[in-house]
Structures are given as C-alpha cells and as structure tokens.
A protein has these predicted regions:
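Membrane-proximal N-terminal amphipathic helix
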Residues: 35-65
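Sequence-level detector for tyrosine residue identity
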Residues: 30-33, 52, 95
C-alpha cells in the first residue's frame, strides 16, 4: 500500500477559490472605505478654511495688524483675504495629492476648496466627491467689513 502524503488537486483548487473570493470582497470594502475617507477629508478642509478665514478677518476687525501669520497688513478687501488664504493654506487635495486643496478659482474639482471674492464677501466652495452634484457641494460666505 502506498501512503500518499500531500494535497489533491481538488483540495488545492478549493483553497485557491476561497482565497480569491476573500480578496475580491476585501478590495471592494477597501475602495468604499477610501472613497468615504476622501469625502470626509474634503468636508474637514472646507470647515477648516471657513474657520481660518473667519478668524483671521475677525482678528483684523479687533485691531490686529498682521494677517494670516505673515507680514501682510490686514485686508481691506475680500480679494486680499482670498489671496492670503490661498498662500497660507497648503493642505493637499485628497483626490489628487499633487495639487493643493485650497485654490483661488471658480472651477470645481473633487476635493478642491475654491476661495473667491465678490465685493466685500469671501465665498468658500468645496466639492466633496467626484462628479460634484448639488448634494456634493459645500458653500460658505464670509463678510469682510
């Protein structure tokens, strides 16, 4: 009698199939996790930008002479506040880390915080997901007095 040791071909195929199924489930779960993490990072950056710009403008209205941690004088215009915010906020875009998240533009790219001005108002808009549908946009307006 032979004493066979080892696995049969069927046993090996079953193990490979099980590993394949587990890998497929893991990849799908991981992709969902990263998508929600990028959206949450975009929302957080939007909130931080609004708070930062508001706080700096408020400091200026209380008599502070310097603006956004630089030697710039406090802004008399919303445009100068936008320029200061874009130059000092260097967070990376979670959807494209080769670009900064905060930009002075009206274009809407996923993960980008667009800071613009009109008259005495600074507007902060953020697209939180790819596609930028109306439910994926955050907007805040800050008045510069």
């Amino acid at each position: 009698m032979k004493n066979n040791k080892g696995f049969t071909l069927i046993e090996l195929l079953v193990v490979v199939a099980i590993i394949g199924i587990l890998a497929a489930v893991g990849v799908v779960a991981y992709n969902g996790y990263t998508a929600s993490a990028k959206a949450n990072a975009s929302k957080t950056m939007h909130s931080q930008a609004v708070k930062y710009i508001s706080a700096e403008i408020q400091k200026c209205s209380l008599g502070e002479s310097k603006f956004m941690g630089t030697n710039q004088d406090c802004p008399a215009t919303a445009a100068k506040a936008v320029s200061g915010a874009v130059n000092t906020m260097t967070d990376k875009n979670p959807y494209d880390t080769s670009n900064n998240a905060v930009k002075s533009s009206s274009s809407f790219v996923a993960g980008q915080v667009s800071v613009s001005s009109s008259g005495s108002t600074v507007t902060v808009k953020t697209c939180t997901k790819s596609g930028c549908g109306s439910s994926d946009q955050l907007t805040a307006s800050i008045s510069v007095d």
